[in-house]
Curated annotation (Swiss-Prot):
NCBIfam families noted in UniProt: L28 (TIGR00009)
HAMAP family for the chain: Ribosomal_bL28 (MF_00373)
UniProt-recorded name of the protein: Large ribosomal subunit protein bL28
Gene3D superfamilies xref list: Ribosomal protein L28/L24
GO biological process annotation, one example: translation
The organism's place on the tree of life at top rank: Bacteria
Native organism: Caldanaerobacter subterraneus subsp. tengcongensis (strain DSM 15242 / JCM 11007 / NBRC 100824 / MB4) (Thermoanaerobacter tengcongensis)
Amino acid sequence: MPKCDICGKGSIRGFQYSHSNRRTIRRWKPNIRKVRAIVDGTHVTLNVCAKCLKAGKVQRAL
């Protein structure tokens, strides 16, 4: 699974409980986007989560 290149956020695992309290393992995935960004004056493709995009931690390349 991809991780955010800015904050390092990745998927986490936990249990999904049914009505009878049976447990099955499930996974929560972050909202990861591939973004062309400017890093040190060059265009680079990064995996960035939506929270970092909204916060403006990445300068997007147009």
